Amino acid sequence: MNKTRNKILNQCETLMLDMDGTVLDLSYDSHIWLKIIPEKLAEKRDIPITSAISFMNEHVIRMKNTLEWYCIDNWSKLLDIDVLEIHRAEKERIRYLPGAKSFLQEISNSSIRVILVSNSHRDTLNLKLKETDLGDYFEDIYLSHDFVYPKENPLFWRELIAKE
């Protein structure tokens, strides 16, 4: 580790990391949510792709910062599309961000407790764990679905602190 990072981390007992966009490349999720799902919705409803995108955007705005937004079961029901199956079909796109794996390897050799804290749905987390060795680097994994609040809600953090 470089000296500045090492100095900061030497003062750290526990390091909480997010998964998507922090450790794993967000392009996997972006591809699914911004391209594949709107295409599937347009095809299923026989509507223009722009209408499918508008429909999704309306619901994104309505559900933003809620657990519904992160729940693939909710989206599957709303869209009448198997969202988990789409995630599985695109699994070859799951990858670490550049430098993330080497950072995790380095930090796992330290005395710092590393935990994953994510808004991910359990099923998509399990898929990502299966496709990577990500689970090897974390002592604990906490999901917002387990606490019934998204990370954006202060109650999530209260529940997490109580559990810790």
Over which residues does each language-model region extend?
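Secondary-structure boundary motif
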Residues: 43, 106-109, 134, 162
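Conserved functional loop/turn residues at catalytic and ligand-binding sites
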Residues: 16, 23, 111, 133, ...
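N-terminal helical cap/lid subdomain that shapes the substrate entry/recognition surface
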Residues: 5-102, 121-123
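Short, flexible, glycine/charge-rich loop motifs used to bind or transfer phosphoryl groups or to couple energy/partner
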Residues: 2-7, 104, 130-132, 160-162
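Catalytic-core regions built around general acid/base machinery
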Residues: 99-111
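Substrate-recognition "cap/lid" segment bordering the active-site pocket of phosphatases
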Residues: 115, 121-164
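Glycine-rich phosphate-binding loop signature in dinucleotide/nucleotide-binding domains
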Residues: 8-10, 109-112, 163-164
